[in-house]
Curated annotation (Swiss-Prot):
Subcellular location: Cell inner membrane
Name of the protein in question: Purine ribonucleoside efflux pump NepI
Keyword Nucleotide-binding: no
Matches recorded under PROSITE patterns: MFS
Function: Involved in the efflux of purine ribonucleosides, such as inosine and guanosine.
This protein's UniProt keywords: Antiport, Cell inner membrane, Cell membrane, Membrane, Transmembrane, Transmembrane helix, Transport
Family: Belongs to the major facilitator superfamily. DHA1 family. NepI (TC 2.A.1.2.26) subfamily.
Alphabetical list of SUPFAM superfamilies matching this protein: MFS general substrate transporter (SSF103473)
Main location: membrane
Segments on the Cytoplasmic face: 1-21, 76-85, 129-147, 197-215, 277-281, 327-343, 388-396
Transmembrane segments: 22-42, 55-75, 86-106, 108-128, 148-168, 176-196, 216-236, 256-276, 282-302, 306-326, 344-364, 367-387
Native species: Escherichia coli O6:H1 (strain CFT073 / ATCC 700928 / UPEC)
Length: 396
C-alpha cells in the first residue's frame, strides 16, 4: 500500500485543496451523526407508535453503534480495490435507505434493520474519513480540513436532540426521518457533483489490518485513544446526575451548561488546526492532562455552580482537540495505511464509548456521585503519560 500511495502522490500530487469535496464529506458526516442520535429525542413517540417499551426502543441506538464497530473493522478489507467515490455514494444511499426504513417501520424488526443500515454507513464512513481527507487537500492543509469535518460533527451533536424533539412535536417522528431522508438525497447529489475519483488499493497489495498494531507506537496510540474516549464517556454520559446533584443545577440551568459545552466544543474544533500545526504530540498529551486537572477541580469544588460551568466550557474546548488530533496522527504517522488505521481507530472508539459509559454507570451506582469524575480523570492522566512516553509522531 505504501508503494501505491507513493505512486499516486507522485502522479497526482495535490497542489490545491478541493474544499467543495471536503464540505460534502463534512455534510454527510453531520447528517450521519444527526440521524444516529435522532431516536434519543424521539424515543417516547417511537415506542408508543410501535407498541414497545422505551428501553426496547433505545436499542435502536445500540444496534447502530454495534454494527458501526464491526463495519469499521471490515469495510476496508471488503472494498479495497473499489473507487472510494462510489463507496461514499453507497454510504449516502444507505443513510437515505435507513431513514426511509425507520420512517415506514411497522415493527421493531424493521426498525432495527433500518438502524443497522445506518451503522454500516456510519462505521464505514468514519473509517475512511481521515484517508479521504488526506486525498482531497495538500498535506499542510489536512489539519484544517479535518477541523472542518469535526466542526460539522460538533454542530450535529449540538442540534440533533433539540431539532429532533422540536420537529417531532411539529410534524411527527416518522416525518422527521422522512426529512432526514431528504438530507440523505442531498448528500448523494453533492457527493456525485464534488467528489473526484479516488482509486482503491490494488488487490495484490492487500495487507491484514491488524498487522498495523505491530508498528512502533501504534498499539500505544490505540490504547491512548481507548483511554481518552472511555474517560470522556465515563464522565459525560452522567453529566446530568453529577451536575444536578453535585452543583444543584435545575433542568434549565443544565440545558445552558450543555449548550455552553457544545459551543465550546465547536470553538475548540475550529481552533484545533492552528494548535495541531505547532505540535500534534503536545496537543494529544496536553489535552487529556488538562481534562484530568478539570476532573480533579470538579471533584473538589464542583458544588460551586460557576466552577462547574467553567469546567464544562474548558472540557468542551479541550476535548475537541482529541478526535481531530488522533485523526491527524493517522494521516501523518500511518499515511500509507490510513484507511486501515482509521478502521481500527473507529472500532476502538466505539468500544471505548461502550466501556466508559458502562463502567462509569457502575461506579455512579455503587461507589458515589463523584466516582465517574475520578475514573475519567485517572484515564485522562494515564493517556497523557502514555502519549508522552510511547506514541510516535512523524513530522508533516
Amino acid at each position: 500500500m505504501s508503494e501505491f500511495i507513493a505512486e499516486n502522490r507522485g502522479a497526482n500530487a495535490i497542489t490545491r485543496p478541493n474544499w467543495s469535496a471536503v464540505f460534502s464529506v463534512a455534510f454527510c458526516v453531520a447528517c450521519l451523526i444527526i440521524v444516529e442520535f435522532l431516536p434519543v429525542s424521539l424515543l417516547t413517540p417511537m415506542a408508543q407508535d410501535l407498541g414497545i417499551s422505551e428501553g426496547v426502543a433505545g436499542q435502536s441506538v445500540t444496534v447502530t453503534a454495534f454494527v458501526a464497530m464491526f463495519a469499521s473493522l471490515f469495510i476496508t478489507q471488503t472494498i479495497q480495490a473499489t473507487d472510494r467515490r462510489y463507496v461514499v455514494i453507497l454510504f449516502a444511499v444507505l443513510l437515505t435507505l435507513s431513514c426511509l426504513l425507520v420512517s415506514f417501520a411497522n415493527s421493531f424488526s424493521l426498525l432495527l434493520i433500518g438502524r443497522a443500515c445506518l451503522g454500516l454507513a456510519l462505521g464505514g464512513f468514519w473509517a475512511m474519513s481521515a484517508s479521504l481527507t488526506m486525498r482531497l487537500v495538500p498535506p499542510r492543509t489536512v489539519p484544517k480540513a479535518l477541523s472542518v469535518i469535526f466542526g460539522a460533527v460538533s454542530i450535529a451533536l449540538v442540534i440533533a436532540a433539540p431539532l429532533g424533539s422540536f420537529l417531532g412535536e411539529l410534524i411527527g417522528w416518522r416525518n422527521v426521518f422522512n426529512a432526514a431522508a431528504a438530507m440523505g438525497v442531498l448528500c448523494i447529489f453533492w457527493i456525485i457533483k464534488s467528489l473526484p475519483s479516488l482509486p482503491g488499493e490494488p488487490s495484490h497489495q492487500k495487507q491484514n489490518t491488524f498487522r498495523l498494531l505491530q508498528r512502533p507506537g501504534v498499539m500505544a496510540g490505540m490504547i491512548a485513544i481507548f483511554m481518552s474516549f472511555a474517560g470522556q464517556f465515563a464522565f459525560f454520559t452522567y453529566i446530568r446526575p453529577v451536575y444536578m446533584n453535585l452543583a444543584g443545577f435545575g433542568v434549565d440551568g443544565l440545558t445552558l451548561v450543555l449548550l455552553s459545552f457544545g459551543i465550546a466544543s465547536f470553538v475548540g474544533t475550529s481552533l484545533s488546526s492552528f494548535i495541531l500545526k505547532r505540535s500534534v504530540k503536545l496537543a494529544l498529551a496536553g489535552a487529556p492532562f488538562v481534562l484530568a486537572l478539570s476532573a480533579l477541580v470538579l471533584t473538589l469544588w464542583g458544588s460551586y455552580k460557576i466552577v462547574a460551568t467553567g469546567v464544562a466550557i474548558i472540557w468542551g474546548l479541550t476535548f475537541a482537540l482529541i478526535p481531530v488530533g488522533w485523526s491527524t496522527w493517522i494521516t501523518r504517522s500511518l499515511a500509507d495505511q490510513a484507511e486501515k488505521a482509521g478502521s481500527i481507530q473507529v472500532a476502538v472508539i466505539q468500544l471505548a464509548n461502550t466501556c466508559g459509559a458502562a463502567i462509569g454507570g457502575y461506579a455512579l451506582d455503587n461507589i458515589g456521585l463523584t466516582s465517574p469524575l475520578m475514573l475519567s480523570g485517572t484515564l485522562m492522566l494515564l493517556t497523557a503519560l502514555l502519549v508522552t512516553a510511547k506514541v510516535k509522531m512523524k513530522k508533516s
